Amino acid sequence: MADNVAGNDRLIWIDLEMTGLDTDRDSIIEIATIVTDAQLNVLAEGPELAIAHSLETLEAMDEWNRNQHRRSGLWQRVLDSQVTHAQAEAQTVAFLSEWIRAGASPMCGNSICQDRRFLHRQMSRLERYFHYRNLDVSTIKELARRWAPAVASGFAKSSAHTALSDVRDSIDELRHYRQFMGTLGGDNGGGVQN
């Protein structure tokens, strides 16, 4: 373990792109991770890996995924890739082990339960690297949409629907919500005074 592994407050942010949403049928085609400190400052970006799949697999995706992954360039990156699921998992775990010990960070991101389900089936070693808890920005978004619509509408994602851009968006989105959390936002959280 590297010298820069410290404390339990670092956060591992992750996103996956998949061929679809069915964990029994679909597959991970891209993975990216970022490690931040507790104040959401980026400490390191992990490898952004397209995972090799056949043209037949990509063509079997639904129309939304085919169009999106062609537009983002992921389609071609997947076809050109030689990286297997096992290699992507090993490279990601190796990166994370340089920054945070296993079990210390919740899995962080948007709609992260879906990512966790795919990891459990296809990259179980990586899934076990996380604490069992999740830091799901989607939960905060859903609460804000219902309880503070102006706060929710104040953030617009800029994502290209690639794993790394989605991870960056998740971090930026939590930074946005944090400024409205008062004392829950921490030292750098700011907050709205009534």
From Swiss-Prot:
Localization (cell): Cytoplasm
Keywords noted in UniProt: Cytoplasm, Exonuclease, Hydrolase, Nuclease
One GO biological process term: DNA metabolic process
EC number: 3.1.15.-
Domain Exonuclease: 11-174
Active site: 132
Broad enzyme group: hydrolase
Top-level taxon of the source organism: Bacteria
One of the record's GO cellular component terms: cytoplasm
The keyword Isomerase is assigned to this record: no
GO terms of molecular function: 3'-5'-RNA exonuclease activity; nucleic acid binding
SUPFAM superfamilies listed in its UniProt record: Ribonuclease H-like
InterPro entries referenced in this protein's UniProt entry, alphabetically: Exonuclease_RNaseT/DNA_pol3, Oligoribonuclease, RNaseH-like_sf, RNaseH_sf
Role, per record: 3'-to-5' exoribonuclease specific for small oligoribonucleotides.
Family statement: Belongs to the oligoribonuclease family.
Record-given protein name: Oligoribonuclease
Organism: Xanthomonas campestris pv. campestris (strain ATCC 33913 / DSM 3586 / NCPPB 528 / LMG 568 / P 25)
Lineage start: Bacteria, Pseudomonadati, Pseudomonadota, Gammaproteobacteria, Lysobacterales
